[in-house]
Amino acid sequence: MESGGPGNYSAAARRPLHSAQAVDVASASSFRAFEILHLHLDLRAEFGPPGPGPGSRGLSGTATLELRCLLPEGASELRLDSHSCLEVTAATLRRGQPGDQQAPAEPVPFHTQPFSHYGQALCVAFRQPCGAADRFELELTYRVGEGPGVCWLAPEQTAGKKKPFVYTQGQAVLNRAFFPCFDTPAVKCTYSALIEVPDGFTAVMSADTWEKRGPNKFFFQMSHPIPSYLIALAIGDLASAEVGPRSRVWAEPCLIEAAKEEYSGVIEEFLATGEKLFGPYVWGRYDLLFMPPSFPFGGMENPCLTFVTPCLLAGDRSLADVIIHEISHSWFGNLVTNANWGEFWLNEGFTMYAQRRISTILFGAAYTCLEAATGRALLRQHMNVSGEENPLNKLRVKIEPGVDPDDTYNETPYEKGYCFVSYLAHLVGDQDQFDKFLKAYVDEFKFQSILAEDFLEFYLEYFPELKKKGVDSIPGFEFDRWLNTPGWPPYLPDLSPGDSLMKPAEELAELWVTSEPDMQAIEAVAISTWKTYQLVYFLDKILQKSPLPPGNVKKLGETYPKISNAQNAELRLRWGQIILKNDYQEEFQKVKDFLQSQGKQKYTLPLYHAMMGGSEMARTLAKDTFAATASQLHSNVVNYVQQILAPKDS
């Protein structure tokens, strides 16, 4: 086992953490009984046909876990999170200090136990119980083929169409279908990996060390402790290009020039601004991997190597806020982590706030308020569809046993979370002071997982005068209400600095609502100078006012080819929604084309909702499009689209 050691992060926090008692109903593992110190993966990738037969595609090898028993009374069994797609064939135990090759390796019995539809428990029995504080290594020999954690793409699902591709996606609870682990954000460990690939392929991982070992082997090491969901691997036909002093872009060769052009020189500016605000960037490198088009997310903040959708290659740097969001996770989420998935707002609400602080410094308050207004519109849309009183519209979500945390995903932790952090800044009343507080918060809880109580107690201790005033229980704005009551945020940050960009968009949208639009007034507005988010805001207003009077959408598309023929994904999404809301069948093909070009969940699901909520022709379009694209979508997205096409409760 390549030992990475846990570094100096075992120093207890200055306070006992509430999160030390946190339960995680989404994990079958005994993560409170054992401390995981290090994980090492030694895997070989094979690209064969799908299926269980010989020569089929899969990852095979070993996962070695370095563990320490935490129970005063010792333990005779260890439970890990696993999945039916993992075939474990052997387990051996080596007691004593890590790397002690003199210690005998003994085979140990193991079996699986049912847990939920998204995983199972792997139970390993010790022939002799381990005592309190005993250390040992457990080596598991296994293979994973088809399953939800490892995504295999055929050549036609990639941008280059020449070679297959494989990647892993751990968040929220999918890495148990990649390797046996404590699949909970409550605990963290360092990891290393040795990955063998076929000729002509390159492996990359979320690690701060990347070494080529011989023609087909790659060694990785992550020297800081991270939760299991942030361990990520991708293998494909990959090239790289430097875009800054500590950043490079990775992509298929056909995309590398576009990626280099779009992000050269800008990432360092984002990182440096983040460091000024939130403290040192501890992860060493910040690289970007542009994924194949079927990647279901805008970005996944795997440390050192963010996985991003190729939709971000807009050609005009207009979608850089997604990168700022992922960079912000370097402090909020990756360094300080939610202890379970019911506290997801601690990752995402803070990251939205951090993203918008960086954006304000780099692009100004007007632009940032405009972007935040589009976020607020998404929250409004979500709450209109789900109903404000839906329990998922609380910041603290109660995830019931058996419920996949991924199924609770929505805009609330992002945008309502952002509103709560903004409210706390508003209580402080001084932006510099609140920035200093955020830096102190990161420093206090770095490399740890926390609950809302840990954060809020720290906030009130940091600002004793606010504690004295009882700001946690101001009627209507109680911290408990913020966390545990569903519905619209009690406080909304002031977005009026964005009025200079929003007002013209609102006024222009009004002109399109009349049955005889004043084309002279419309053409006097120079939207050619508008930034992408101003156009997005305008289209959101048009969508809210749809259906428009007959003929207006056709005229709108003809007047603004910049919108109706856009290549920018945010514009294509909204234009598609407007087409469907107005049943503008001449342009239906554009909806299908967009859904065939990418598989991002945030773009895909709203369009299927709009098609199924539209005319008979729109519903037919939904079924035809899904039949044509299902094979190139991520398995989670396929499941969600199927639920939209044929709701279970209908």
Swiss-Prot record:
Substrate binds at G298, G299, M300, E301, N302. Its EC number is 3.4.11.6. Keywords: Acetylation, Aminopeptidase, Hydrolase, Metal-binding, Metalloprotease, Protease, Secreted, Zinc. The active site is at E326. GO terms for molecular function: aminopeptidase activity; metallopeptidase activity; zinc ion binding. Binds 1 zinc ion per subunit. Its cofactor is Zn(2+). It is found in: Secreted. PROSITE patterns: ZINC_PROTEASE. The modification N6-acetyllysine is found at K446. GO terms for cellular component: extracellular region; plasma membrane. Zn(2+) binds at H325, H329, E348. Pfam families: Leuk-A4-hydro_C, Peptidase_M1, Peptidase_M1_N. Exopeptidase which selectively removes arginine and/or lysine residues from the N-terminus of several peptide substrates including Arg(0)-Leu-enkephalin, Arg(0)-Met-enkephalin and Arg(-1)-Lys(0)-somatostatin-14. Can hydrolyze leukotriene A4 (LTA-4) into leukotriene B4 (LTB-4). Belongs to the peptidase M1 family. Monomer. This is Aminopeptidase B. The gene is Rnpep.
